[in-house]
Amino acid sequence: MSIRVGQKAPDFTATAVFDQEFGTIRLSDYLDKRYVVLFFYPLDFTFVCPTEITAFSDRFKEFKELSTEVLGVSVDSEFSHLAWTQIDRKSGGLGELEYPLVSDLKKEISSSYNVLTEDGVALRALFIIDKEGIIQHSTVNNLSFGRNVDEALRTLQAIQYSQENPDEVCPVNWKPGSKTMKPDPVGSKVYFEAI
């Protein structure tokens, strides 16, 4: 199944680890009032993955201020997730996280988002899902390099701005407070004349 921006995000129910406990997560429970940053990573106890997972946790408050939940997903079991969160960061673990890690042991979530490799691990994919459950943004990195949390936040802010201001669009490198433009031949000239 191919999944694209503008389509409904595949719902899922799965076991997750949060606050050193197991719980059930359903994507649709997060929607209606909040956006969701759903990111996939290859495996627990690896090398690039903890740098991304902890970076999202360290910046979680900024996502929360934007009415956004963060969910991390890998094909590991909830037991593996729990063990990894019980190891401190300086020893290659995750320590306490501000958001749940979802277990996709059966690889159903990774498959439904079309991010599963032939080797059976998820690529470094990130989806920003709006309150209506529509995928507004997706990126997929290969396994050997991590994502940019600043860019995820900036993209989220641009999505929210454009949804709140449907008569405007956000040009390259847009950040809150930057100029936007009207998406028409006359209105866009105001933007281009100012740069």
Curated annotation (Swiss-Prot):
Induction section of the entry: Up-regulated by high-intensity light and H2O2. Down-regulated in the late stationary growth phase as compared to the early stationary and exponential growth phases.
PROSITE patterns for the chain: THIOREDOXIN_2
EC assignment: 1.11.1.24
Active-site residues (renumbered): C49
SUPFAM superfamilies found in the cross-reference section: Thioredoxin-like
Chief localisation class: plastid
Domain of life: Eukaryota
Key words, A-Z: Chloroplast, Disulfide bond, Oxidoreductase, Plastid
Localization terms from the record: Plastid, Chloroplast
Location of the Thioredoxin domain: 3-161
GO cellular component, one term: chloroplast
GO aspect biological process, one term: hydrogen peroxide catabolic process
Catalytic activity field: a hydroperoxide + [thioredoxin]-dithiol = an alcohol + [thioredoxin]-disulfide + H2O
GO molecular function: thioredoxin peroxidase activity
Job description of the protein: Thiol-specific peroxidase that catalyzes the reduction of hydrogen peroxide and organic hydroperoxides to water and alcohols, respectively. Plays a role in cell protection against oxidative stress by detoxifying peroxides.
Family: Belongs to the peroxiredoxin family. AhpC/Prx1 subfamily.
Subunit structure as annotated in this protein's UniProt entry: Homodimer; disulfide-linked, upon oxidation.
Annotated protein name in UniProt: 2-cysteine peroxiredoxin, chloroplastic
